[in-house]
Amino acid sequence: MKVAIVGASGYAGGELVRLLYHHSSAEVTCVTSRSLAGIPLSEVHPQLTGFSDLRFENPAPDAIDADVAFLAVPHTAAMTIAGKLLSRGIKVVDLSADYRLPKDTFEKVYGVTHTDYFPAPYGIPELHRKECINAKFVANPGCFPTGATLAAAPIASRAHTIIFDSKTGVSGAGDNPSATTHYPNVGDNVSPYKWTSHRHLAEMKQELSKLGSKAACYFTPHLVPVNRGILTTAHILLNEPLETKEVEKLYREYYKDEFFVRYQKPMLSAVRGSNFCDIMVESEGKRVVVVSAIDNLVKGASGQAIQNMNLMCGFKETDGLDAPGLLP
């Protein structure tokens, strides 16, 4: 099966190529970049030297030859491409935010007009597997909402307030240097940003609502001096008290059939480079604390995108993804 990665120069694009190298049925045959056409993929992603001889291309959407296309492009760019690919029978997984939210919500949160909106499955397979199976298009979730929603899902409907506090690695900001990600500003430091207004909060609220939760939801992210990973602490305030053993039983039962969700002490290093989400809970009266750990570039982006592709195309859900993390 031929795969195109549209916007392959960034971290997510590199991870897609790395992970798909191990897929039993998918072969990356096209990697695109508007500014790097003609340059070898391995020149931008040296970790792929010896694993791919592809060069970046800059084809028009109607010239892309593929069965599946991953859109690893900036927000607002996917809406100019997705429909054209779908009209040619190419299945699409969109890693941008363009189709994660209803049209009016997207336009309010991102401050732009959506020029080609259509509803799409929201690709957290553990929660929306049926919608993703055989789908022609899936909107891949944001990294923060993935870790947060998986942390809260089993107990969200019992809560009146949910507060997400996330620590994220610098790769989540992308590969364009900035003062925020400059080493002297990141090293030996922890800094909150967008304290009350991060755009991913809209996805979290959307997913909690789908889970039947009426809880008020709040979110604050922090940048920490690591390359990869998101550690999310969910403070879940319940309507009625639950003991830790009851909450633990509930979580174990909820995720018992989910290969990529493991009930164990969350550590960023244990999930680094993998598609796993590690979760553990503890409670005190009406307060439940849930901690989750994911790799923001894998379960938070490219790995989950491949997991969705597998569901869309009838492959084993773990194909290309069943490798452990990189501890230490």
Swiss-Prot record:
Its EC number is 1.2.1.38. GO terms for biological process: L-arginine biosynthetic process. It is an enzyme of class 1 (oxidoreductase). InterPro entries: AGPR_AS, AGPR_type-1, NAD(P)-bd_dom_sf, NAGSA_dehydrogenase, Semialdehyde_DH_NAD-bd. This is N-acetyl-gamma-glutamyl-phosphate reductase. It catalyses: N-acetyl-L-glutamate 5-semialdehyde + phosphate + NADP(+) = N-acetyl-L-glutamyl 5-phosphate + NADPH + H(+). Catalyzes the NADPH-dependent reduction of N-acetyl-5-glutamyl phosphate to yield N-acetyl-L-glutamate 5-semialdehyde. Its main location: cytoplasm. NCBIfam families: argC.
